[in-house]
Amino acid sequence: MATAALFETSITSLPLLHRGKVRDIYAVDENHLLIIQTDRVSAFDVILPTPIPEKGKILTKISRFWFDKLAHIIPNHLTDITPESVVSSREQDQVSDRAFIVRKLKPLPVEAIVRGYISGSGWKDYQRSGTICGIALPAGLREADKIPDGAIFTPSTKAEAGSHDENISYSVCEQLLGVSLAAAVSRHSIALYTAAADYALTRSIIIADTKFEFGLDEANQLYLIDEALTPDSSRFWPAESYRPGKTPPSYDKQFIRDWLEQINWNKTPPAPPIPEEVLVQTIEKYQAACRVLTQ
């Protein structure tokens, strides 16, 4: 692939705070962070050795689109500060079109997953127990079926790179967050998902599920943080190929997950390198999702 990929940033003008699975985070000042979307890709909570060129820029564009579109539901951590203004001139190519300056908030210790359709780990849970994260669902549902009575909130723990997220029950979420905050996170998550899913359907995309993250400011005001409804955090299905009973081809990194399942990787580090043909098809899916949703 002709375009060079950014696997890891090397900003020296700011202190590095954290390298996540995909994002590198730097301190700007005591109230702001620089978050850079690299081209790293993770699957099954493991970072793969092969970056996907332009992926970080695509995720940044999609996140900004959703942060703006959904700001009437809940405030988010974005600021008007330009990333180029806080780094040196020689570092600007590392932040251009792939970074945000955000408010420094206290992240909540759960991932807020919303499922509108049964797929992925939710489908596996349902096959095993008839439930997803302790939520009982009617018998006889098929893979990729729309969940009766509307989307459900199914939180999980937040894993560091190399560890695995674990689905948790709502009662455990309440223990971690407190009753009122858990209720607010659940309510806002479902409202965000519903608004996004309704819009996406007008663009012939089904958002099967997604993951949100939230943070609190010093006044305990809740904010949407991290990323929003990207192909990394969501399952996007083309509506025209949707058929209940089988998960359709998607505009997201499920393509990489499927490839990893096919080669029988054991889902522990080190991950195998991604072949060129899988890379090309993955970036085409990300580009298509961005084009269809944001234009």
Swiss-Prot record:
Keywords attached to this entry: ATP-binding, Ligase, Nucleotide-binding, Purine biosynthesis
EC number(s) per entry: 6.3.2.6
Reaction equations catalysed: 5-amino-1-(5-phospho-D-ribosyl)imidazole-4-carboxylate + L-aspartate + ATP = (2S)-2-[5-amino-1-(5-phospho-beta-D-ribosyl)imidazole-4-carboxamido]succinate + ADP + phosphate + 2 H(+)
Pathway of action: Purine metabolism; IMP biosynthesis via de novo pathway; 5-amino-1-(5-phospho-D-ribosyl)imidazole-4-carboxamide from 5-amino-1-(5-phospho-D-ribosyl)imidazole-4-carboxylate: step 1/2
One GO CC annotation: cytoplasm
Single GO term (MF): phosphoribosylaminoimidazolesuccinocarboxamide synthase activity
Enzyme class: ligase
Keyword ATP-binding found: yes
InterPro entries noted in UniProt: SAICAR_synt/ADE2_N, SAICAR_synth, SAICAR_synthetase_CS
GO biological process terms held by the UniProt record: 'de novo' IMP biosynthetic process
Family: Belongs to the SAICAR synthetase family.
NCBIfam families linked: PRK13961.1 (NF010568), purC (TIGR00081)
The protein, known as: Phosphoribosylaminoimidazole-succinocarboxamide synthase
